[in-house]
Amino acid sequence: MKHLPKHVRPRWRYLAVGIEAWPDAGIERSDFQRALWFAAGNLLGDPGSADAGVRVVAYSFRDGRGEALVRARRGTVSRARAAVACVSAVREHPVRVCVRGVSGTMRAARERYLDGLDTPERRSDVAFDGDARDGVCRGENVDVVAGDDGWVGARRRDCGTDGE
């Protein structure tokens, strides 16, 4: 099959997306892609989501934090951003997604908006609710194990882990 001339080929834009979830959430690329397609279909309808052509082209996720590059057609960036914003859960795990930026090439999007994933610090001495508990520290954010109820999100100053 012959290649299309350059002026006929579809032009793409790449959305750099940040993903946050609880530390025990295991979210695979296919799960995030499915949630994105579902959100785009619900928001834009079948013709609109097909026109936007949102697709995850790069993905990394570990310990509750991840990044993705989402491809969208050039004229549909605002609709693709709205579809990404509609993703609130992936495989029953609540997630927070944010579009960090938009670029015309994958390389530029990676260099400008994706910073790589730092390794979170797992600790067993987080002071929370008058007790020492297990927790995961990521920068100023701390996710504390709250018994059978799951996780509680807090800041370092709330947990007494300043400067340690």
UniProtKB/Swiss-Prot annotation:
Enzyme Commission no: 3.1.26.5
Biological source species: Halobacterium salinarum (strain ATCC 700922 / JCM 11081 / NRC-1)
InterPro entries: Pop5/Rpp14/Rnp2-like (IPR002759), Rnp2-like_sf (IPR038085)
Reactions accelerated catalytically: Endonucleolytic cleavage of RNA, removing 5'-extranucleotides from tRNA precursor
Lineage: Archaea, Methanobacteriati, Methanobacteriota, Stenosarchaea group, Halobacteria
GO MF annotation terms: ribonuclease P activity
HAMAP family to which the protein is assigned, alphabetical: RNase_P_2 (MF_00755)
GO CC terms of this entry: cytoplasm; ribonuclease P complex
Protein name per the record: Ribonuclease P protein component 2
Quaternary data: Consists of a catalytic RNA component and at least 4-5 protein subunits.
Localization, UniProt: Cytoplasm
Superkingdom to which the source organism belongs: Archaea
